[in-house]
Amino acid sequence: MRRRKGRISKTAPLRDEGAAGWENGYLEGRSDGYHYGLCESIYARAAPEAAPSRNIKVLYVKAEGSPYASLDQGIEEALRASVREVVVASPNDDVAQLAEAANPDLVLVLDAAGCSFKTEQVDRMRDGGLLTAVWLPDDPYHSDATADIARHYDYVFTIEANCVSMYRDIGCCRVFHLPFGVNPGFTRHVRVDETYRHDICFVGSAFWNRVAYFDEIADYLAAKRVKIIGYWWERLRHYEKLASRIEGVWMSPEETAKYYSGAKIVINLHRSADDKSHNSNSRNVPAHSVNPRLFEIASCAAFQLVDNRPELSQFYTPGVDIATFESPSDLVGKLDYYLTHDEERREIARRGLYRTVNEHTYRNRIQRLLSVIFG
């Protein structure tokens, strides 16, 4: 039986769609592979020459809370690469007794809000002739508490530049601004499956300024492939619009790096310094400095849109190795733009990765800390 001319097979459109889907997937996979290869090259060539190890012993007291896991890991690794010997302790240990036995050249404490290391132990160590330093990760949000803590130490390092004068005003003599950084060997770009691939990703708790932002752009986000990870997002007025995209959990640093690596855009929105429902900042110290997440996102070669803080330009150049936003409407406009400009987006992310590996690692920060104390 002869086939009629002009008859169209019912399977042809499906085959065409399948071929187009295969081609798009192939091109996207090839682009991802190319990006991954360039990132691996950057990790290898951007790292500066390691500084000589100092012939000193450091006792490091960890913060040991889930939000501080990547900080503890990065600081400990950097110390081990920078000094002769490192002894690590928990804030719940009898650190003063441990220090008496270990006799370190320096006791360094990462003091976390809500689970602070006992200042009585700091006083015991100082009375025994030991040199002490504290690195404060929650400034300026809990400055009421940290003001009482800081005066017990020989050296105070704060991630918020505006807190330096506050600590000096209350009698701390040796106070320095020292931002956090990242460990690129631990927090880095990885190849991921579809589970971690999204147009837009945000990782962090729903502080009220973030709630206001996300409520304003909820309709836009609901039309995109979005992932939001963190506590308290049920506070959203438009929670139902985004509920299926929200995972209300704490995410490990390893899992977080996978979500950063798989996202086209990561939003980084700092918390507010005047949120009285979460903060203890009665001096109203403004927040001008950047959060650790800034460096962690960049170290994953992820493109980030970050709210523009005064200190940001000391670390990255907007439009070159990072992108910024000023308002919810500006954020939506830039999300739209960069979601449709793949190569420009990835090029900015790779420049950010290079600068991070070259300038903003924990090894870099620890070298500065040790230089301040020991010269």
Regions of interest found by a model, annotated:
Residues V192-I265, R271, D275:
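Conserved catalytic-core segment of nucleotide-activated headgroup transferases in glycan assembly
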Residues M1-L38, A150-H152, A161-I170, R174-F176:
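Helix-enriched interaction subdomains in cytosolic or periplasmic regions
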Residues H35-C173, N183-R188:
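Extended catalytic core of nucleotide-activated donor transferases of GT-like folds
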Residues V83-E85, Y153-F157, C172-F176, H238-M251, ...:
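Active-site regions of enzymes building and remodeling cell-envelope glycoconjugates
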